[in-house]
Swiss-Prot record:
Gene: rnpA
Family statement drawn from the similarity comment of this UniProt entry: Belongs to the RnpA family.
NCBIfam families linked to this entry: rnpA (TIGR00188)
Gene3D superfamilies in the cross-refs: 3.30.230.10
Function of the molecule: RNaseP catalyzes the removal of the 5'-leader sequence from pre-tRNA to produce the mature 5'-terminus. It can also cleave other RNA substrates such as 4.5S RNA. The protein component plays an auxiliary but essential role in vivo by binding to the 5'-leader sequence and broadening the substrate specificity of the ribozyme.
Pfam families named among the record's database cross-references: Ribonuclease_P
Protein name: Ribonuclease P protein component
Organism: Corynebacterium aurimucosum (strain ATCC 700975 / DSM 44827 / CIP 107346 / CN-1)
Signal peptide location: none
Length: 122
C-alpha cells in the first residue's frame, strides 16, 4: 500500500499531471510525469503517484490485480529510483494501464514503467 503522502488524490491533481506534464508509453502502460511548482513543490514530501486502471483492462479481479502490481512497482520506484537515481520529491506520476497490462507479469510492468521513466532526465 502506498502511504497517503505519496498518492495523488483529487481529480485536479490527476488532470494537472496528465494535461500539463510529459508522456511516454509502452505496450502495457502510459506514464505521465509533471514537476510540481509553487505551493505543491514546497509541501512535497516525496514523489506522488496516481493509477488509472479502466474496464478495458479486464473484469474487476483483473483490474484489482493489475492495480496491486502497479502499486508494488511504485513502491519499488520510491525505494530504488530510476537508473540509480532517486525520484525527486516534487514530481507527480500518473500511470495509465493499457489493456495489455491485464495479462502482463509484475516484472513486465516494472520493466515497462522504468523504460518509460528513463526517457526523461529526472
Amino acid at each position: 500500500m502506498l502511504p497517503a503522502q505519496h498518492k495523488l488524490t483529487s481529480p485536479r491533481q490527476f488532470r494537472r499531471t496528465i494535461k500539463g506534464g510529459r508522456r511516454a508509453g509502452t505496450r502495457t502502460v502510459v506514464v505521465h510525469l509533471r514537476f510540481n511548482d509553487g505551493e505543491d513543490a514546497i509541501a512535497a514530501t516525496g514523489p506522488r503517484f496516481g493509477l488509472i486502471v479502466s474496464k478495458a483492462v479486464g473484469n474487476a479481479v483483473v483490474r484489482h490485480r493489475t492495480s496491486r502490481r502497479l502499486r508494488h512497482v511504485c513502491m519499488s520506484l520510491m525505494r530504488d529510483g530510476v537508473k540509480g537515481t532517486m525520484l525527486p520529491a516534487n514530481v507527480d506520476i500518473v500511470i495509465r494501464a493499457l489493456p495489455a497490462s491485464g495479462e502482463a507479469t509484475s516484472e513486465r510492468l516494472e520493466r515497462d514503467i522504468r523504460k518509460a521513466l528513463s526517457t526523461w532526465d529526472i
